[in-house]
Design a protein with these regions (language model features):
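A generic structural signal for short
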Residues: 11-12, 34-35, 54
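Generic N-terminal amphipathic, Lys/Arg-enriched alpha-helix
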Residues: 1-11
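N-terminal glycine-rich anion-binding loops that anchor highly charged ligand groups
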Residues: 15-46, 59
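Short, basic, glycine/proline-bearing loop/turn elements
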Residues: 6, 32, 52
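Active-site-proximal beta-alpha core segment in soluble small-molecule metabolic enzymes
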Residues: 37-125
Length: 125
């Protein structure tokens, strides 16, 4: 096989599958829930495979990543990134329809922005 003469990404799919399964087995064996961060691959099919192997849900760093994953059918998303501003709150409101969404809050400003959203069960450690 000749290689392209420009930069490209090559993924050994068998090795990737082996690594995903091995990590999930290890975590399962130690009673650790896996909620992988999709920022490393940003590919809904890989996130779906992680769920099929036993991940509890996915983590997205940005609202746009969460929107892409939800549109692809992934419905349990954790968004640890603080959302500030009405435009992002409205995008979050639209995203919440039909999925389980968890967010973090680390300031009063963020909490005030989220206060207008329909909330389910809140967990406060």
């Amino acid at each position: 096989m000749s290689l392209p003469d420009t930069p490209y990404l090559a993924v050994d799919l068998d090795l990737m599958e082996s690594n995903l399964a091995r990590l999930q087995r290890y975590l399962d064996g130690h009673g650790i829930a896996n909620r992988p961060h999709v920022k490393t691959h940003k590919i809904p099919a890989i996130a779906q495979r992680q769920l099929e192997l036993g991940a509890a849900g996915i983590t997205c760093q940005k609202l746009g990543e969460a929107e892409v994953m939800a549109a692809a059918g992934l419905h349990d998303i954790f968004l640890p990134y603080n959302l500030v501003g009405q435009a992002k709150i409205e995008r979050l409101r639209a995203l919440m329809a039909g999925i389980t969404l968890s967010v973090t809050v680390d300031s009063e400003v963020v909490a005030r922005g989220l206060a207008s959203l329909p909330l389910g069960t809140a967990y406060v450690p």
